[in-house]
Amino acid sequence: MYKFKRSFRRRLSPIGSGNLIYYRNMSLISRFISEQGKILSRRVNRLTLKQQRLITIAIKQARILSLLPFINNEKQFERIESITRVKGFIKK
């Protein structure tokens, strides 16, 4: 029996060699945060373990220094406002 070799293509990291993982680099950090403001997992980010650790530390530092919100509730407030508007129209 013959064993076929599967071709394995290594995926490029979303963080280039020129990008600095730093809490002030908001354009880089914002790519690794969900819409709710949560840190995305390593599988979703496709980062190495070391890069994920550095990103996590940078995000936490940015949150503590108020550069990033801990939780992003903007969409939740929009939904509540639209529900109250609909209820107001029904009463009248």
Swiss-Prot record:
What is any one of the record's Gene Ontology cellular component terms?
plastid
Cell compartments where the protein resides: Plastid
What does the entry give for GO biological process?
translation
Instruction: Fetch the SUPFAM superfamilies from UniProt.
Output: Ribosomal protein S18 (SSF46911)
Which molecular-function annotation in GO is an example for this chain?
A: small ribosomal subunit rRNA binding
Tell whether RNA-binding is among the UniProt keywords. yes
Extract the Gene3D superfamilies matched here.
Ribosomal protein S18
- Which keywords does the record carry? Plastid, Ribonucleoprotein, Ribosomal protein, RNA-binding, rRNA-binding
Asked whether the keyword Endoplasmic reticulum is assigned, the reply is no
Q: By its UniProt entry, which InterPro entries does this protein fall under?
A: Ribosomal_bS18 (IPR001648), Ribosomal_bS18_CS (IPR018275), Ribosomal_bS18_sf (IPR036870)
Q: How does it assemble?
A: Part of the 30S ribosomal subunit.
Identify its protein family: Belongs to the bacterial ribosomal protein bS18 family.
Q: Which PANTHER family match?
A: 30S RIBOSOMAL PROTEIN S18 (PTHR13479), SMALL RIBOSOMAL SUBUNIT PROTEIN BS18M (PTHR13479:SF40)
Q: What is this protein called?
A: Small ribosomal subunit protein bS18c
Taxonomic classification: Eukaryota, Viridiplantae, Streptophyta, Embryophyta, Tracheophyta
